[in-house]
Structure formats: structure tokens, C-alpha cells
């Protein structure tokens, strides 16, 4: 296999700089206040807990037929980089774009072509100052990510059970 590892990126959501004590005081209102993305309530909560990133890792494992140890995620607060692929020869490719949900949707709809969405695209010249800083996800601070990774590793019915449990947990949290 040419792919050695892939990383998805997460902004870290509203709690990326929280401590364990801060996390004990989280409310639905705080969780729904995402610093970058504008989304519906369910996906915003999943983004705040990084459950969405864990689920996306499972999706990547299934879509690209990769073992769980070859798929991970990192926090990238600027949301300029959306994924990286490390190849067996040591080279890496990275997808850069603005934080606009229309871009991945348009790419999926138009595949293998691309739609001209320059106004929402990445208007960031190569000579500008880039901030491509990344940090590991704290699995203690974001247990949903760790649980999703484990469900992906176990495979079978575990990912489906995870999705159902997440639906119920988010619904209960928002009450």
C-alpha cells in the first residue's frame, strides 16, 4: 500500500484550550458556539466533543480500506489544512482550503470535475504568512474521539453502535 498514514484535521472547536476542570462546566450553549464552522446543532456538538472527527476517521478507514493505525486526526485551529496523506516514499500531500462546508460538498457532487467556487475558495497567496501548526488531540480531554477510534479499531457492529449512542447522548445533552 502506498499510503503510510493519513491525518484529518479538527479545529478543536470551542473547547480546544479548555482544561479538564473547564470541561466539567460545559453547557449546551457553550458547545454550540463554534469558533469557525457554522453548522446544525447535532454536528456542532459532535464537533465540540471531537466525536465528528472520530467518526470521520472511521469513514476514512472504510472508504480507503485502511487499518485503524493508519488513520488519525490532529488539531489545527486555523482550519486551513483539512487532511494530510503520508506516502511510503516519505512525501506528504496536504489539502488546503478556506473553512467553507460548500467546498467538500461541491467536490463530492461534481467528482471527478471541480466547480468554480473561487469566492469561497482558498484566496491565500503562497507569499502570505501561513499558520500550519498542528497538535495532538488530548484523548483524555476529548474521550469521544478516543471511543470512536476504538470503535473503528474493533470494526464490526461497533461503529454503528457508536453512532446510535452518540445520537442519544447529543439529544439528551441538548435537552
Residue ranges and their predicted role:
Residues 1-175:
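Catalytic, metal-anchored helix/loop core of enzyme active sites in primary metabolism
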